[in-house]
Amino acid sequence: MAEVRLGENESIDSAIRRFKKKIQKAGILSEVKRRERYEKPSLRRKRKAEAARKGGRY
């Protein structure tokens, strides 16, 4: 779980920015989006094969 403690003289905005970065780095948002809808196993295999073919390029 991502946790951010507010430091002395730190604004709420900067703490929120740090929190968002931690969530992004942990992959929590992408996991939530992935689990929003059911994905059939055949489609999951197809997506993984496509990602492997691309080789993780940007």
Curated annotation (Swiss-Prot):
A cellular-component GO term for this protein: ribosome
PROSITE patterns assigned: RIBOSOMAL_S21 (PS01181)
Segments of skewed composition (Basic and acidic residues): 49-58
HAMAP family: Ribosomal_bS21
Region span, Disordered: 38-58
NCBIfam families (UniProt xref): S21p
Classification via PANTHER family: MITOCHONDRIAL 28S RIBOSOMAL PROTEIN S21, SMALL RIBOSOMAL SUBUNIT PROTEIN BS21
Name of this chain's protein: Small ribosomal subunit protein bS21C
